[in-house]
A protein has these predicted regions:
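Bacterial Sec-dependent N-terminal signal peptides
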Residues: 1-25
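Carboxylate/His-rich catalytic cores and anion/metal-binding grooves
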Residues: 113-133, 233-236, 240, 292-305
Length: 806
């Protein structure tokens, strides 16, 4: 009976959608819900099924194991104990997985999953306070997390209480749309009513923006479901309040709260927050027909797309603040490109497309979707990347879960909703934005796509049911043009692409590749077939010369898929000593047994030896999204294109063979050398040579959130060595989330054979110069452990780029 009820609910949703499509006379572009879009291809359908059968159950298990559900039980008074977890926003992890599970339930009914969601939602509802408030760490009075939320509700802008509310609302709306049940929606409405009562422009209300955005998107979704305009007004308030600092709080680039949105023209701060905020702004602007906000969004987008977008569709270059650096800071090894940020980038760009009909926004969606987003989850579906660098020395590995577990839940809800991005409608006209095999019911029309995209560019679209006069708009992807994204020159293809071809019922039509879409106006009937051929040649890409880390390098791309080279496919497992000449032919072939079935690229390359000799080698590239599915190894997207850009394999040194550690807690002044160094550290002995103290393009160590304190970093060698010199390259650069400077002073200690620490007898001064190595000679010591103890400058943090031993 429940299954029948669910199916009837979905039919109702589709019927409403069909009616809107058939009668709308305006020009607004509307999304086509994923429920009437059914994929049966060999690319997305298996991934969506793995998400349903592996990723979602795995994420729920981790929520159980990590105490996420227990926190709700504790807030409900059902159990006794301590609040678990390290973050005030841990409640959002179950919300996101519930959202993903709801999408999965709508696509394929599962009785056990349906009942499981009922039980979880019942638990969450019991944790809600009578006035609608719901943040468990506050209800549970977890003083251990008071640094986040303070001493009472709504005290701090960065408490994430509104972030919790936003994900609660989005999850509840998804569950209602999927099942027709109001159990979770009623919880969300009660919470949203409290939010709209508490925050706003009136006397007695709190005057500040959302902190971590998502409440804006969420309230817009709730408005669409309920029709209650107070939710739209609430979303509009949070958008308008951003950057105004009405309550006296400090402006913050980190939260895009540094100036009003209408005055913003550069994308800054935390990348996920930016994507969520601008998605919410786009929602409000669309629902209120506010073109001034869209003008501001276009300015910000242009800055992102022309100066801060990674070739994989990722955003956010720095681990510090999980956000953006200055223009053209697109470092590969230290690229953050958080999985959540890539998903947020899709959300924002798709909304920009809906507002404008411009394909450049879908180009960003597709680029992020096939590369950065899919890199965030293993092919097995149970391991995840938090950050997605474009280069690795083998130190990166997907994890089953994280203390800050925002990404796994986000993956589950996003992958389940991928069919949502394939089609859109404008009146009776149909946009085909993404190409994927399957059927879609849009109004009285049933379309069927047949294709092997993204491995093959041939697409057939058949009208299976229905007829009528309307336009079909077929997107011409950015990967067939001179530049991947719009007309900006951040990235440029080195050679022209072949021209796409299109035919209707076997009759060719003209295609202008400079257009966004191939638009076909006609009276359609059952059996009509559109044949589209998007030539998928391997294309080389060069980056703008201002992107320093990409100079004299090339990226390989075929269709929407960015490729990388990985150590497993090279004879010596080393990749940085290879370079690829522009004249070399690159061939593509399908490998059905590799990585679940992928296109691989093969070519001849050159290799630089340790003595400078040049050798011919074979090079294989795989889709970037599939790297690290065969174990840890080196990887790079941007391949050297000149011998000077290739790096010969360095010979091992005393330092390179050492284990590296740093102190976790504070160092006492009386005996700094004895402080425990129990936290793993990295980046200081990887043999990458810094260009300057602000060179953050390669891994480095920094003392996160430490300012003006004594900090340490230590080496533990594979055996005792006699040493008499050390060289330290200090970190120094400015960042909105923390400034890093060379230390005020430092000293070097060694551990003797009896396990006692002593300072070395230095023959030269402990210098703190920047942009160079600081070398210290000392009386030879035989030791298996060395430690630097650094006194940081007052008010500043610090770090080490590279540390050598002789």
């Amino acid at each position: 009976m429940q299954k029948r009820k669910l199916l009837l609910t979905n039919m109702l949703v589709i019927a409403i959608t069909c009616n809107a499509i058939g009668t709308t006379q305006g020009t607004r572009i509307e999304e086509v819900p994923f429920t009437p879009v059914h994929l049966n291809d060999m690319f997305w359908a298996p991934r969506i099924e793995v998400n349903r059968t592996v990723s979602i159950p795995s994420a729920f298990r981790e929520c159980e194991k990590s105490g996420r559900f227990d926190n709700f039980a504790l807030a409900a008074g059902l159990i006794e104990g301590e609040h678990q977890g390290d973050f005030s926003f841990d409640d959002t992890d179950p919300y996101k997985v519930i959202e993903g599970a709801s999408y999965a339930l709508a696509a394929k009914y599962d009785k056990a999953l349906d009942h499981y969601l009922d039980s979880v939602i019942t638990l969450i509802a019991k944790a809600q306070e009578p006035d609608g408030y719901l943040t468990t760490c506050v209800t549970n009075n977890c003083t251990r997390l008071s640094g986040w939320w303070g001493t009472h509700k709504w005290e701090r802008i960065n408490s994430h209480e509104l972030y919790n509310s936003g994900h609660l609302i989005e999850s509840a709306v998804a569950h209602y749309r999927a099942t027709g049940k109001r159990t979770f929606l009623d919880v969300a409405i009660k919470n949203a009513d409290l939010v709209c009562k508490t925050f706003g422009p009136n006397e007695g209300q709190i005057h500040r923006p959302g902190g971590h955005p998502i409440i804006e998107m969420a309230l817009c979704k709730l408005y669409k479901v309920t029709g209650n305009k107070k939710y739209l007004e609430g979303a509009k308030y949070f958008v308008e309040e951003t950057g105004r600092c009405t309550d006296g709080h400090h402006p913050s680039e980190y939260s895009q709260d540094h100036k009003p949105i209408l005055e913003q023209d550069e994308i800054v701060g935390h990348a996920v927050r930016a994507g969520y905020l601008y998605s919410g702004v786009a929602d409000v602007a669309a629902l209120t027909n506010d073109q001034e906000y869209f003008k501001a969004l276009e300015r910000i987008w242009q800055n992102m797309a022309s100066k801060k977008l990674f070739i994989t569709g990722g955003i956010g270059s720095r681990a510090q603040g999980e956000g953006f650096g200055p223009n053209y800071e697109l470092n590969n090894h230290t690229a953050y490109c958080e999985t959540c940020a890539a998903i947020a980038n899709v959300y924002w760009n798709y909304r920009m497309f809906l507002a404008t009909g411009e394909s450049k926004y879908v180009d960003v969606c597709e680029r992020a979707l096939y590369n950065n987003v899919l890199s965030g989850v293993s092919l097995s579906g149970d391991r995840f990347f938090y950050d997605n660098p474009l280069e690795s020395g083998g130190e990166h590995e997907r994890q089953k879960w994280f203390g800050c577990a925002c990404c796994p839940g986000n993956v589950t809800r996003f992958i389940a909703s991928v069919p949502n991005y394939i089609y859109a409608v404008q009146g009776r006209d149909i946009y085909v934005n993404l190409y994927a095999q399957g059927r879609a019911t849009i109004g009285n029309i049933e379309l069927e796509q047949t294709t092997e995209y993204p491995w093959d560019g041939k697409v057939s679209i058949r009208i299976n049911k229905g007829s009528g006069k309307f336009a079909v708009r077929l997107r011409i992807p950015g990967w067939l043009k001179a530049h991947p994204i719009g007309d900006n020159n951040l990235y440029t293809y080195l050679t022209p692409a072949r021209h796409p071809q299109c035919a209707i019922n076997g009759t060719a039509i003209n295609v202008d590749v400079t257009d966004d879409y191939i638009t076909i106006h006609r009276a359609w009937k059952k059996g009509d077939i559109i044949e589209l051929d998007l030539p998928m040649d391997v294309r080389r890409i060069e980056a703008n010369d201002n992107a320093e880390d990409d100079r004299n390098k090339v990226c390989l791309e075929r269709g929407p898929v960015v490729f990388c080279i990985e150590g497993q496919d090279q004879v010596d497992h080393y990749i940085f000593n290879k370079y690829l000449l522009h004249s070399t032919n690159v061939t593509a072939r399908y490998e059905p047994t590799l990585l679940g079935g992928v296109i691989v690229l093969d070519t001849q390359a050159k290799e630089v030896g340790q003595s400078g000799e040049i050798r011919d080698v074979q090079l294989r590239a795989i889709p970037y999204s599939t790297w690290n599915n065969r174990g840890n190894d080196q990887m790079e997207v941007w391949i050297a294109s000149t011998p000077t850009a290739a790096i010969a394999t360095p010979k091992p040194t005393i330092a390179s063979r050492a284990q590296t550690f740093s102190n976790r807690g504070p160092i006492q002044n009386d005996a700094p050398e004895t402080a425990p160094t129990d936290s793993w550290a990295g980046g200081t002995n990887d043999q990458w040579e810094p260009k300057r103290s602000s060179d953050t393009s390669k891994p480095y160590h920094y003392w996160w959130l430490k300012r003006g304190s004594k900090e340490s970093i230590s080496y533990k060698f594979d055996r005792p060595y006699t040493i008499s010199n050390t060289q330290v390259y200090w970190l120094e650069f400015d960042h909105y989330d923390g400034d890093f400077k060379v230390p005020q002073s430092w000293a070097l200690y060694y551990k003797d054979a009896n396990g006692q620490w002593h300072e070395v007898e230095a023959h030269s001064a402990y210098t703190t110069r920047k942009d160079c190595y600081n070398s210290v000679d000392f009386k030879p010591v035989t030791t298996q452990e060395l430690k630097i103890v650094a006194q940081l400058q007052e008010g500043y943090s610090g770090g080490v780029l590279e540390w050598k031993i002789q």
